[in-house]
A protein has these predicted regions:
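Non-catalytic structural scaffold of enzyme domains
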Residues: 1-260, 264-326
């Protein structure tokens, strides 16, 4: 392609940084935009109508900034608004869906526990997805985790007490996997790992989302190691499309529910370790990262100041520490 792709990530807050952080490792030569709707976080306790309106505003802003594709890096916004977003904008809009199918395929002999926001758990899209599975799936709403994450409170006594109390409602020894159904929950992998029995696998939907992104863009994304990531993307038939799928430029539906998480570890080795910022351009507002990537950050449409950018780096460092925990 003649120009670097401009790819936008949208979340109610800082949860979507977990998806952006992985994209910074995997891809090279891309311009990224990140929109955190800090004025209205959390989304998980709002009505569907409110989330649709806020999501349309956020994605509209990102498209006006030249986004070639938008990743809705928020399970709640995907559940509530993905259909409206795809109907309103011509660029590919990729959603996040809980990786319950991946969990069922990998550990289906045992129940799966999905933790998410109340709206995601109550959503019709999740009900349809779970209804197609042949394994037992339990669900647990954890709305307080979003606020803990936003406040940089990751492993405090309050966090531990909250998670221990909520997870105690289930027979954890019976589980095969725990699915993170909210991108904010990636900040708590270490605490979850301590509470869960050692055989229970922690799974998120980041790999599948980035595979779908690469598939939608049809070869426009390059791996940090120089390969064409689209060759690795999983492609499914239109009838398998659900909340996390998308429409490519030719209108053909494609979806990848999940991918082998060993790919994440391998790409981490090839693409570099911690993705710390290398340079800040005060004129453009861009932060430059390894692999030739850059990011412009926005809080509800406003460019970030120095203190806010420093806080972003704190979040990214936390995510780096959580990355290999499963």
């Amino acid at each position: 392609m003649d120009k670097d792709l401009k790819i936008a990530f949208f979340d109610s807050g800082i949860g979507g940084l977990s998806v952006l952080a992985e994209a910074l490792r995997r891809f090279s030569g891309a311009e990224f935009l990140y929109f955190a709707d800090e004025d209205h976080v959390p989304y998980g306790t709002k009505s569907r109508a409110q989330i649709v309106r806020l999501s349309l505003d956020a994605v509209g802003f990102l498209v006006s900034r030249g986004a070639d594709a938008v990743v809705v890096a928020c399970n709640t916004a995907t559940s509530a608004a993905i259909s409206e977003l795809r109907g309103a904008f011509s660029v590919p809009v990729i959603g996040m869906e809980p990786a319950v199918k991946l969990a069922a395929d990998s550990f289906g002999a045992r129940p799966t526990l999905l933790i998410a926001t109340p709206l995601t758990i109550a959503g019709e899209k999740l009900a349809r997805l779970v209804g197609r599975l042949e394994c037992e799936t339990w669900s647990l709403p954890l709305p307080c985790l979003v606020e803990f994450a936003q406040d940089l409170e990751f492993d405090s006594p309050a966090v531990r007490a909250y998670l221990q109390g909520e997870l105690a409602k289930f027979e954890l020894e019976r589980l095969g996997s725990l699915v993170l159904g909210c991108t904010h929950f990636n900040y708590f992998k270490d605490v979850l790992r301590e509470i869960l029995p050692s055989h229970v696998r922690i799974i998120d939907g980041i790999d599948g989302t980035l595979n779908r992104l690469a598939s939608e863009l049809g070869g426009g994304l390059k791996l940090a190691c120089g390969e064409d990531f689209s060759e690795l993307a999983c492609k499914f038939d239109a009838e398998e499309l659900d909340a996390g799928g998308g429409q490519n430029a030719r209108g053909k539906s494609r979806q990848c529910e999940g991918s082998d998480e060993s790919a994440r570890s391998e790409q981490g080795k090839k693409g570099g370790d911690e993705q710390g910022a290398e340079e800040y351009d005060g004129n453009s507002g861009k932060i430059y990262y390894p692999n030739g990537n850059s990011v412009e950050y926005f809080y509800s449409g406003r460019a970030l100041d120095a203190a806010q950018l420093h806080k972003i780096e704190v979040f990214l460092k936390r995510l780096d520490a959580m990355r290999e925990i499963n």
